Every structure is written in C-alpha cells, then in structure tokens.
Amino acid sequence: MIFGAITNSWREQLPTHTVKELVGAAVEKGAKHIELRQTCLGECESGAGDDWRPNLDELQSVVEAYPSLTFDLAMALPCLTQTIDPVGDMFQAALAGAKLVGGAQPHLRVVDPAPVEGPWSSPSDIPEEALGLAGLATEAARQGVIMSMENSSLPIRNMAMLVEQVRSMVPEAAGAGLGLCPDPTNQLRRFPDSDPLAELDALPLDMIKLVHFKQ
C-alpha cells in the first residue's frame, strides 16, 4: 500500500505557504502520494464552483519538483444530483489537470457534496442524474483517465451498486476505469450504526482505486 496526504489537510497553512512547499514537507514525513484537492490548491487553482479551474502551469511546477511522487487530482462534482456535460469546460479542465499530474496513470477523484436520498435498496432507486456517470466515465476512459468517486452522503455499498450499474451501461474498458475512493469515516458520520469496514472489505479489488483514512 502506498501512503500519502491530501492537500485539504493543509487548509490553515495555505495562506502563508505554497503548495510546492507543503508537498515538500509531506515528502520529508514519508509521503509517497499526494491528492491535489480542489479548494486547497493555493497557487495551483483559480475560481470556485462551476468556474473552478486548475492552474496547469503551477501544477506542472509541483509535479516536476517531486518526480518520485505520484499524484491524483480531486474535485467536488455534483455528478449524483446533476447532469454534468462530459465535454463541458469544467470536466474537460479537470481531465486535463488529472492527465498533467497523473503521469502514466492519470486519476480524477470526484465527490458529490450535495445530500443524496438514501440508502438505496436496489438499482431501481438510483436517480437518473447519477446514471449520467456513464457519459463521464466514457469520456474519462477515452482520455486515459481513471475516475473514482468518494462516498459522501451514501454508504459504500450503495456507491458500489452505482458503479456496477454504470459499468453495465458502458464499454468494458470505460467500466474498468470507473471505481471508488471509499472513506469509512464519511459513512460513520451519516450512518453511525453501519459497518463501513465490512463494506470496504466486500468491494471487488478492481473497484477500489484509492482509500481515504482520517481521524
């Protein structure tokens, strides 16, 4: 397992430090991977919401400064509650950023921060907007980008149900590139009586693209 850090851990330090400096501090503590998280990228981003864009020149500078590290790009994307245009400027900019920082294995990690009614009992409960992931996953795969989703307001098992449903709707290669970034702590906040570690353990290995651990 490769351990690393997420830039939103440095929210308080970002006003007085560059992302490049903070990544260097993480490297000194043994980090091998860095998740570059929207809203916590300092000089490496501009705008907010639909107008958010990664600053590709600054991201390239960070990646070139630490060639031994691997990186993924992470963003909030309301892909479960809204229909996102796969060829729209926002998603295309995110894919460009993921390809720039990801090297041989570009990875875009997304999370829908909006509340989602759940948990779901069966695939028939999945809202139509969430099935729009098929178009996003297909476009990401076309550009060679792995796409993973973090669970926010749904349990891990429901996110797995969604991935399985979307995989059945797209070509095999596109489906293989779509997976999860499980966060057991997120699940406990919403469903305190659930067992997120058991749900994580039950996931097929090819569905796990990244795992978040936090206190």
Which ranges hold each PLM region?
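N-terminal pre-domain/capping segments
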Residues: 1-99, 103-104, 141, 160, ...
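Acidic/histidine-rich catalytic cores of soluble enzymes
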Residues: 5, 11, 16-17, 33-34, ...
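Conserved radical SAM core fold
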Residues: 38-43, 112-117, 187-188
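Substrate-binding cleft and catalytic face of glycoside hydrolase catalytic domains
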Residues: 72-78, 113-115, 154-156
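Active-site groove signature of glycoside hydrolases
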Residues: 98-122, 143-153
